[in-house]
Amino acid sequence: MSTLAIEIRMSVAESVSVTNDTLSVNLNDGRTILVPTAWYPRLLHATPIERKKWRLIGRGHGIHWEDIDEDISIEGLLAGKQSGESQTSFKKWLEVRQTRITKRTTGHAKK
């Protein structure tokens, strides 16, 4: 019996853009992945400036947004996976975010 070894290379990201509606990722193999930002609630709630502040991680196997603490893998995008964050975790993040925004704009936390 003989076996055939096939090497599968995972595509990696080369560039990213995010609009109010769409996350777009250009891959090194020429494909572009387009998914709704609604799949990733933190991206959906991010400001345009925060959305632009991404960096590739793992040699292009993932994307990280420091300001909103979001990581998305290329493998997950290719598999059509949405955010796995629980509602509880997201609500907590949103509350902390709102507190920080309030502090920045008013100089103190909202009570």
Question: Where are these predicted regions, by residue range?
Answer:
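Motif-centric detector for short Cys/His coordination patterns
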Residues: 1-111
